[in-house]
Amino acid sequence: MCLAQCAARRLLAQVHGALKPAPKKPNWCWEMARPSSNMADFREVFAKAKHIAIITGAGVSAESGVPTFRGAGGFWRKWQAQELATPGAFARNPSRVWEFYHYRREVMLSKHPNAAHIAIAECEKRLRKQGRSVVVITQNIDELHRKAGTKHLLEIHGSLFKTRCTNCGNVTANYKSPICPALAGKGAPDPEIEDAAIPVEELPQCEEDGCHGLLRPHVVWFGETLDPDVLTEVEKELDLCDLCLVVGTSSVVYPAAMFAPQVSARGVPVAEFNMEATPATDRFRFHFEGPCGTTLPPALARHESEIIA
């Protein structure tokens, strides 16, 4: 990639680095033929790929029973996620926001990777032995890819199971259940339940020596910018890939919405696996409709040309 293209991409990352919805009609500036749903053709492309980038969204975890808090009915109590997942909401009512995230953490502790997560992890393990690479770039914060065994994982929106201190900035993995005594039994989503109104000093606190600052979930909230180091890694992997899969994502949240179209624009095959078409579908070479746990395993299974080590 030339220096001008690199500079342009970095500029896009700066402009669109904040988590926000994409326009209703993305202004893509390139045209392609209608995507194919021919699995045999995809498998031939897959067999030749050396560096595969897999971009995943909420749809890949839906079959694990993970609540998405998107669309109609996507409420926790009286609020939608967009009302709670903001710096302002946390500043105004950290107890309410922590109840919401505590509920999500507790739910996720009982969930397991589905066939799509496992297919990705097994593909990565198998291809690594052949000198080929797979990287997963996920918008999900549920860590199901990690549970499935994925090693090369970029979590662009953070993780439910990491905390960040609002005082010292320390980031720590945290799988405690409950995350603090005051949140035990709290966070039920019933709209009739009142907020627990937990005092700040009883909410999760930093355990670094002498700090005791208030912890927050280490996730990217609406209006916040993505970690520039993570974006740099994403950029590097997308520049390197010779095949890109977009799995279970609606392609309507920036900056992830532009990742695969940018890859497609430089001539790299992109395959979309989703329950329905998205605003970006026509920019890709392949589109496979249906549950990811059904469509993805045969797509990533061992090809007859692969040599078993």
From Swiss-Prot:
<feature type="binding site">
    <location>
        <begin position="274"/>
        <end position="276"/>
    </location>
    <ligand>
        <name>NAD(+)</name>
    </ligand>
</feature>
<feature type="active site" description="Proton acceptor">
    <location>
        <position position="157"/>
    </location>
</feature>
<feature type="binding site">
    <location>
        <position position="104"/>
    </location>
    <ligand>
        <name>substrate</name>
    </ligand>
</feature>
<dbReference type="GO" id="GO:0036055">
    <property type="term" value="F:protein-succinyllysine desuccinylase activity"/>
</dbReference>
<dbReference type="GO" id="GO:0017136">
    <property type="term" value="F:histone deacetylase activity, NAD-dependent"/>
</dbReference>
<dbReference type="GO" id="GO:0036049">
    <property type="term" value="P:peptidyl-lysine desuccinylation"/>
</dbReference>
<dbReference type="InterPro" id="IPR027546">
    <property type="entry name" value="Sirtuin_class_III"/>
</dbReference>
<dbReference type="GO" id="GO:0036047">
    <property type="term" value="P:peptidyl-lysine demalonylation"/>
</dbReference>
<feature type="binding site">
    <location>
        <position position="292"/>
    </location>
    <ligand>
        <name>NAD(+)</name>
    </ligand>
</feature>
<keyword id="KW-0809">Transit peptide</keyword>
<dbReference type="GO" id="GO:0005634">
    <property type="term" value="C:nucleus"/>
</dbReference>
<feature type="binding site">
    <location>
        <position position="165"/>
    </location>
    <ligand>
        <name>Zn(2+)</name>
    </ligand>
</feature>
<feature type="binding site">
    <location>
        <position position="211"/>
    </location>
    <ligand>
        <name>Zn(2+)</name>
    </ligand>
</feature>
<dbReference type="InterPro" id="IPR026591">
    <property type="entry name" value="Sirtuin_cat_small_dom_sf"/>
</dbReference>
<dbReference type="InterPro" id="IPR003000">
    <property type="entry name" value="Sirtuin"/>
</dbReference>
<keyword id="KW-0808">Transferase</keyword>
<feature type="binding site">
    <location>
        <begin position="248"/>
        <end position="250"/>
    </location>
    <ligand>
        <name>NAD(+)</name>
    </ligand>
</feature>
<dbReference type="GO" id="GO:0005759">
    <property type="term" value="C:mitochondrial matrix"/>
</dbReference>
<dbReference type="GO" id="GO:0070403">
    <property type="term" value="F:NAD+ binding"/>
</dbReference>
<dbReference type="GO" id="GO:0036054">
    <property type="term" value="F:protein-malonyllysine demalonylase activity"/>
</dbReference>
<dbReference type="InterPro" id="IPR026590">
    <property type="entry name" value="Ssirtuin_cat_dom"/>
</dbReference>
<keyword id="KW-0963">Cytoplasm</keyword>
<dbReference type="Pfam" id="PF02146">
    <property type="entry name" value="SIR2"/>
</dbReference>
<protein>
    <recommendedName>
        <fullName>NAD-dependent protein deacylase sirtuin-5, mitochondrial</fullName>
        <ecNumber>2.3.1.-</ecNumber>
    </recommendedName>
</protein>
<keyword id="KW-0479">Metal-binding</keyword>
<keyword id="KW-0539">Nucleus</keyword>
<feature type="transit peptide" description="Mitochondrion">
    <location>
        <begin position="1"/>
        <end position="35"/>
    </location>
</feature>
<dbReference type="InterPro" id="IPR029035">
    <property type="entry name" value="DHS-like_NAD/FAD-binding_dom"/>
</dbReference>
<dbReference type="GO" id="GO:0005739">
    <property type="term" value="C:mitochondrion"/>
</dbReference>
<keyword id="KW-0496">Mitochondrion</keyword>
<dbReference type="GO" id="GO:0008270">
    <property type="term" value="F:zinc ion binding"/>
</dbReference>
<dbReference type="GO" id="GO:0005829">
    <property type="term" value="C:cytosol"/>
</dbReference>
<comment type="function">
    <text>NAD-dependent lysine demalonylase, desuccinylase and deglutarylase that specifically removes malonyl, succinyl and glutaryl groups on target proteins. Has weak NAD-dependent protein deacetylase activity; however this activity may not be physiologically relevant in vivo.</text>
</comment>
<feature type="binding site">
    <location>
        <position position="206"/>
    </location>
    <ligand>
        <name>Zn(2+)</name>
    </ligand>
</feature>
<dbReference type="GO" id="GO:0010566">
    <property type="term" value="P:regulation of ketone biosynthetic process"/>
</dbReference>
<comment type="similarity">
    <text>Belongs to the sirtuin family. Class III subfamily.</text>
</comment>
<dbReference type="GO" id="GO:0061697">
    <property type="term" value="F:protein-glutaryllysine deglutarylase activity"/>
</dbReference>
<feature type="binding site">
    <location>
        <begin position="57"/>
        <end position="76"/>
    </location>
    <ligand>
        <name>NAD(+)</name>
    </ligand>
</feature>
<feature type="domain" description="Deacetylase sirtuin-type">
    <location>
        <begin position="36"/>
        <end position="306"/>
    </location>
</feature>
<keyword id="KW-0862">Zinc</keyword>
<feature type="binding site">
    <location>
        <position position="168"/>
    </location>
    <ligand>
        <name>Zn(2+)</name>
    </ligand>
</feature>
<dbReference type="GO" id="GO:0036048">
    <property type="term" value="P:protein desuccinylation"/>
</dbReference>
